[in-house]
């Protein structure tokens, strides 16, 4: 089983390397669910020597995108491939909550040669079995999911069904609310291909500044506790 850190800061990138994570999902603005990071941040992570999978998401909110947004996403995918990212993390749905196969295939064509993860947009899908079949047909490498629920604990029954249904045809990575209290159970009962978590805490950035913001900051001790609990 592999471990993926959701890294939204330079500190998180360095910690992932220090603690020997298998890979990172690189993003920015984790407080809004994450958006595509800057070129400088992507290049920093790659140069730091960790497998970097870049989130391709032009804005917060849902996953039904306009033509202009799709154009930006295609440019971002090509850019990530050209500068050496190991993979990309994407998700695109129709207005009715189905995977947009046509746009997904455009993304897959641009991403040819690197890995592709379909993120938790999957948890917004109307029919998860049909959606998984589409992703398998489109040769997506893995799905990140909380089992169609707010968090992995609530979604464990569906995650179990997903892993059985996938039958090794696509990787299933669990994520969403993973912590030291539940990771051991996830590992033991589900045996997913990978577990994804951020290990962050709320923090008031630059609290004496006029521009102070509440952010999610990586917490080394919390990350270490989660990793340790996975081995129990």
Positions of PLM-derived features:
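Active-site-adjacent beta->alpha loops and helix N-cap segments on the catalytic face
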Residues: 11, 30-50, 68-71, 93-112, ...
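C-terminal alpha-helical cap/extension of soluble enzyme domains
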Residues: 60, 84, 167-232
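Catalytic cores of alpha/beta
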Residues: 11-15, 64-77, 123-138, 162-164, ...
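Glycine-enriched alpha-helix->loop->beta-strand junction motifs that scaffold or abut catalytic
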Residues: 19-24, 48-51, 83-87, 110-114, ...
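Glycine-rich phosphate-binding active-site loops on the catalytic face of alpha/beta enzymes
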Residues: 25-35, 79, 83-95, 140-153, ...
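Hydrophobic faces of well-ordered beta-strands that scaffold small-molecule active sites
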Residues: 3-7, 24-26, 52-56, 88-90, ...
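N-terminal pre-domain/capping segments
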Residues: 1-24, 29-36
